[in-house]
């Protein structure tokens, strides 16, 4: 297998249908497996919830962020209804995350546009958030 094929496998998007009872368990198990493979040493895990309630269909991230914050989530949460992370402050928030956390594992939560057949699906992808350190 060449490097390009390996990268494609690592970035494979998995789809979960929330109307199927076993999907939550399947996605949880997969996410735990991914987190275990990424967490080494003292790497912290943060949850980056992207979106705004000011745009129709874009409130998933801040809604999840608010729910996690109110449930005393073990991970640091960025992006809530009160303090949303959106297009205008996303880059600054990512810089802040990488400044406050050394080599963090970032779980990003965001609504997305996609194919009609994917409406309502929850996706999980092991991929990188793009961040370029200022020179």
Features from the language model and the residues they span:
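Conserved small/polar residues in nucleotide/adenosyl-binding loops
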Residues: 131-135
């Amino acid at each position: 297998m060449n490097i390009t094929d390996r990268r494609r496998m690592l970035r494979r998007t998995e789809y979960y249908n929330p109307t199927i009872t076993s999907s939550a368990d399947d996605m949880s198990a997969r996410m735990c497996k991914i987190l275990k493979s990424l967490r080494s040493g003292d790497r912290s895990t943060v949850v980056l919830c992207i979106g705004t309630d000011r745009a129709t269909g874009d409130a998933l991230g801040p809604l999840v962020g608010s729910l996690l914050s109110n449930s005393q989530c073990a991970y640091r949460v960025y992006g809530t209804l009160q303090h949303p992370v959106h297009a205008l402050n996303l880059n600054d928030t990512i810089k802040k995350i990488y400044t406050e956390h050394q080599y963090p594992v970032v779980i990003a939560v965001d609504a997305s546009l996609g194919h009609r057949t994917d409406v309502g699906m929850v996706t999980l992808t092991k991929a990188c958030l793009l961040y370029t350190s200022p020179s």
